[in-house]
Design a protein with these regions (language model features):
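Cyclic-nucleotide recognition modules
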Residues: 81-139, 143, 147
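A conserved hydrophobic position in a structured secondary element of the catalytic/binding core
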Residues: 25, 61, 83-84, 107, ...
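Cyclic nucleotide-binding regulatory module and flanking cytosolic helices
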Residues: 1-43, 88, 93-95
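Structural motif
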Residues: 65, 110-112, 214
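Small beta-barrel nucleic-acid-binding modules, principally OB-folds
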Residues: 38-42, 48-51, 167-171
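Cyclic nucleotide-binding regulatory domains
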Residues: 46-108
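Polybasic "coupling" helices that flank or enter modular domains
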Residues: 108-109, 124-191
């Protein structure tokens, strides 16, 4: 599949800055994968794939992030996962023949590396490490989706707002998140007025400061204390880039990836 018409940015065939996930690969594996990687700058709001499409690209965020959403009847989508430089998005059934049920949108614009799914799976057939990369990325998406389902059911909008902001900040590696309160409201499935009220309360406490199209975290400890425990469950030690380096939430059994009961 070619580049989506929704994606903008000049595409180059080489780039010297890898993502956190790509940096976790061995030199030999990185060279194997690098033969087919392309790089581009994608803008916020760009649609990476739509529900019902045969998404055939895998995306490695370098300085941006992708929001994975389940679309609703009114055309909006509820976010179930955020993929930043710690992971990759686009690992579906692998055949390219089964339409995907989610929508992926660039949550934070930036640099991305992409590869055709067919080319990735061809390389993975020669390299066990790439098979593990795909497995931990799928497990990370599943963990986020499961935890988000729980979070949306049992936690308050305030706690979820704080969790979302922290998670996105971690994914981007920055305390300034370029996002509108309207976008957060849509991602969390809450009213815009509710998101505005929560942001105002946090700003009065000095926890965050809000500007046009951006939110800056001023008191991370305070924000963490206000967030639900889903934030710690989805912490950096569970990210695909860390799992490739060894340890973490998942363990490997006969080539498969499963939950590590020791964590």
């Amino acid at each position: 599949m070619g580049q989506s018409p929704h994606l903008f940015g000049a595409i180059a065939t080489d780039d010297s800055t890898p993502s956190s996930l790509l940096s976790a690969l061995s030199g030999e594996t990185a060279r194997l994968l690098g033969r087919d990687l392309r790089h581009g700058d994608f803008r916020e709001g760009a649609v990476v794939w739509d529900a019902g499409s045969d998404a055939g690209q895998i995306f490695f965020p370098i300085s941006g992030a992708i929001s994975i959403r389940v679309p609703t009847r009114n055309g909006h989508g509820i976010e179930v996962a955020t993929i930043g430089p710690e992971g990759a998005a686009g690992f579906h059934d692998g055949s390219g023949t089964v339409p995907v049920l989610t929508q992926a949108v660039v949550q934070a614009g930036g640099r991305f590396a992409t590869i055709a799914a067919e080319a990735f799976h061809a390389a993975a057939s020669e390299c066990e490490e790439l098979g593990r990369l795909a497995a931990v990325c799928k497990a990370w998406l599943l963990l986020q989706s499961q935890r988000t389902a729980l979070c949306n059911t049992v936690h308050s909008a305030d706690a979820r707002f704080c969790r979302w902001l922290l998670r996105t900040s971690d994914a981007l590696g920055a305390d300034i998140v370029r996002v509108t309160q309207e976008a957060i409201a849509e991602a969390l499935g809450i009213r815009r007025t509710t998101a505005n009220l929560i942001a105002q309360q946090l700003q009065r406490k000095g926890t965050i400061s809000c500007g046009r199209g951006k939110i800056a975290i001023r008191d991370r400890a305070g924000l963490q204390s206000a967030a639900c425990d889903c934030y710690s469950v989805l912490g950096p030690r569970h990210w695909p880039c860390e799992l490739l380096r060894g340890g973490g939430l998942f363990r490997r059994i006969d080539g498969a990836v499963s939950l590590n009961p020791r964590i």
